[in-house]
Amino acid sequence: MQRKNFSSGAKWEDIVGYSRAVLVGNQLEVSGTVATDETGTVGKGDFYAQTKFILQKIEKVLNQAGLEMKDVVRTRMFVTDISHWEEVGKAHGEFFKDIKPATSMIQISALIDPDYLVEIEVTALRSDIESSIDRSRMQMWNVKS
């Protein structure tokens, strides 16, 4: 299966040894994404603004890989203060209201920079490529494809 790595050009990708996203077959995995750009942290102190910026950033890498937000099947949201879940959820809902991917929102003690309040990972599947799923196993569990 072919693998394609996507880079944002951030210096940390080479230092830490990771890619912004990796496409293998029909599956794209997007690395943990925070609200930062070339000027620094976006939306300091604002969970909603950071979440919205992060999802816009994720949408860009999805587009680079030939996917769209509608192809997202899973999101993982890591937040430094779960009491702000409604702000994070509101921004997430603006992007995924009609898509409704599987999701998790998890409180963590800290992110790599104290100004980062939210980090999001995404899994997306290209629907135009036939999946390599073993359909016979799905029938065994009475799962409809």
What are these regions (language model features)?
Residues 1-145:
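Short, polar/acidic, helix-capping and beta-turn segments at strand->helix junctions
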